[in-house]
Amino acid sequence: MFVRFLCYYQHGKGLEVPRTLFDTVWNSKAVALLSLSPRLGPARWVCALIGLWLLFAPLAFWAPTAAAYMNGTLIGMLVIGFSVLVRPAVGVSPAAETTGPTYPPGWSDFSPSIWFQRAPIIFLAFVGFFISRYLTAYQLGHIDAIWEPFFAGALDNPQNGTEEIITSSVSEAWPVPDAGLGAMIYALEIMTGLIGSTRRWRTMPWVVMAFGIMIVPLGIISITFIIIQPILLGTWCTLCLIAAAAMLIQIPYSVDELVATGQFLYRRKKAGRPLLKIFFTGHTDEGEWQDEADDFYQKPSRILRDMIGGGVNIPWNLALCVLIGGWLMLTRLTFGTTGGMADADHLIGALVITAAVTCFAETMRLFRFIIIPLGVALLITPFVYEVTTAGLINTLICGVVLIALSLRCGPAYYSYGSWDRFVR
């Protein structure tokens, strides 16, 4: 498949396939054959790196056809999947694999690595993946138009809002299609979400950290791009909003696994174990071996409840914060706010939504206090920028209400060991 992709892709651009390319391909095949040996686990990671390149190559060379882009994406994901997603897991120490608990010490019969917990993240990653691939197809010139039901572009531009956003100077500043990079990140999220057992919080710490990095910081970057759309570009992108919402909702479902892995590494360090080695190979932990798997032989309603509510719930005060944040983002329409005041309302509203949704995770409840300075900012901005009387009253009320709502923690139904002191 690797040979067929490279030959097809190069001929698609009208280029001759050099001999060195075939040498590289056959060497890669040799590595793939070596990876079949259980003693040569590193060869599987070499194959995974080849798969990563196959994911990126259509973006790096601006794939001229949709078939070339689809071929690279599909084969790249399959190469990575068959290299490192299948069992036995690569690089996990025997101590981590055969001893130790399923639940982190001190946690109340709840493992953040169970499939019920990962399923919402993987589902949302698929949503973002398909949206990003669709946007990439337009950026690569594979389709002539893109769906946009709500937002128009500039008056002197026949493009709609989505088309204008993804062909703007911000997007074109990247050397490759930025939507394609998003699709690649979502693909990696899907695959890292599938790696490892229900004990991967201690058997594969580096995978958990990589998974968290792809979701939390990159999710914040995605939200930042949404924030700048009306401020710098003057319009919106419906599909970008949906993808950003999918990324944002992933954050509360992913942070508890990061907390469990951080606690595990801290305990191993206190025990005098080699931290760097354990980070890559995992280790055992306090507690007895528990050979437990996810129980899918339940009522669908019970499974759905476990998927949605595992370590995550929506306190009424944080739900109201999300609504107020959305209301602030719409003051251009509701109060006719313009200029710097409209930009300030939009920026603060988006940050309030991000903070409140993140705090849906019980392990992140302390983070809600960041809403207080955002509320204080709302009490200042009406006196800095021009605003109507109605807009002034609205902003001041929103600021006071946000400060009051952020004081309540909300219920927490699980225990998180030493992290409980931060769930308040």
Regions found by a protein language model. Name each.
Residues 7-32, 39-47, 53, 59-348, ...:
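Membrane-interfacial helix-loop segments of redox and metal-homeostasis proteins
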